[in-house]
């Protein structure tokens, strides 16, 4: 039993080693198939158009389509199969050739994308032509800021070129007249001759402190407040409601004030006159 078990173990280990050697022999073939599969996926990724994002513009989509259409297909995958059985020197040569071919493909794709770019430049040129002012507005007298503010159609309907020219001519004529007027600065001799009468007056007259010569003034107090006013006065008793006094009552008040003022003045000036006479 022990020998058989030992023999069994030896056979098992030999079989296990044989399986490992077979797996090592199969590993390079698996690597080759995996490299072929990856190259296929890469080629498929290059040939299939990628979806554009939602926010991309129409111009970007057109450029992307042009690039995708004009990119030539990559070289066949047979080269990758042959590369497995070649030396490292031959592999380096193949890689250099593939790099040069990829550069040529990029150059051809860039040249093919130029007509697509030309199509995008078309609308921009048209927009510039539209933004440019028309020929009839280039030689117009009306400035562009007024046309922009009120609208070119409204300005053309309401104002003509002749009216604008007339208004501008009137402004220029007014400026010429203002410049042709004599300067207001005059010689001091002329000023003295013009204002000689004014300077002949005194300071009080020139300052307008009083207006003219003095005149005799007479008080109308005694002439207005006479007994005739009391005789001619009539009180309307029917329309006396809510009144405290009337014209007659006002007259009596003023008359009493006048009498009191006269008495006070007589007392004051009478005492002063008596004192002066006593001194002398």
UniProtKB/Swiss-Prot annotation:
**Pfam families found in the cross-reference section:** TEX33
Answer whether the UniProt record assigns the keyword Cell membrane to this protein. Answer: no
Question: Which InterPro entries has this protein been placed in?
Answer: CIMIP4
What GO terms fall under cellular component here?
acrosomal vesicle; sperm flagellum
Describe the function of this protein. Answer: Seems to be associated with spermiogenesis but is not essential for sperm development and male fertility.
Q: Identify the stretch(es) annotated as Disordered.
A: 1-147
Chief subcellular location equals: cytoplasm
Here the segments flagged for biased composition (Polar residues) are 35-49, 89-100, 127-143
Q: Which UniProt keywords apply?
A: Cell projection, Cilium, Cytoplasmic vesicle, Flagellum
Write out the annotated subcellular location: Cytoplasmic vesicle, Secretory vesicle, Acrosome; Cell projection, Cilium, Flagellum
Name the chain's protein.
Answer: Ciliary microtubule inner protein 4
Q: Which domain of life is it from?
A: Eukaryota
What species is this protein from? Homo sapiens
**Cysteines paired by S-S bonds:** none
């Amino acid at each position: 039993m022990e020998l058989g078990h030992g023999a069994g173990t030896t056979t098992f280990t030999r079989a296990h080693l044989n399986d490992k050697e077979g797996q090592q022999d199969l590993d390079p073939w698996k690597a080759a198939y995996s490299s072929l599969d990856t190259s296929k996926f890469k080629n498929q990724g290059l040939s299939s158009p990628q979806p554009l994002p939602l926010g991309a513009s129409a111009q970007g989509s057109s450029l992307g389509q042009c690039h995708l259409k004009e990119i030539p297909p990559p070289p066949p995958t047979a080269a990758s199969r042959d590369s497995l059985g070649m030396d490292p020197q031959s592999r380096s040569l193949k890689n250099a050739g593939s790099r040069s071919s990829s550069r040529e493909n990029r150059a051809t794709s860039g040249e093919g994308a130029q007509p697509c770019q030309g199509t995008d430049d078309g609308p921009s040129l048209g927009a510039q032509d539209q933004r440019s002012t028309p020929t009839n507005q280039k030689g117009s007298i009306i400035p562009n800021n007024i046309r922009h503010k009120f609208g070119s159609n409204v300005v053309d309907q309401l104002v003509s070129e002749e009216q604008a020219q007339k208004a501008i001519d009137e402004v220029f004529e007014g400026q010429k007249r203002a410049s042709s007027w004599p300067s207001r600065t005059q010689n001091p001799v002329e000023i003295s001759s013009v204002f000689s009468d004014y300077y002949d007056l005194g300071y009080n007259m020139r300052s307008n402190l009083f207006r003219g010569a003095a005149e005799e003034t007479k008080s109308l107090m005694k002439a207005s407040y006479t007994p005739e006013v009391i005789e001619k006065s009539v009180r309307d008793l029917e329309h006396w409601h809510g009144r405290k006094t009337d014209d007659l009552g006002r007259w009596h008040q003023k008359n009493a004030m006048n009498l009191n003022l006269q008495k006070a003045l007589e007392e004051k000036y009478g005492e002063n006159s008596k004192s002066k006479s006593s001194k002398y």
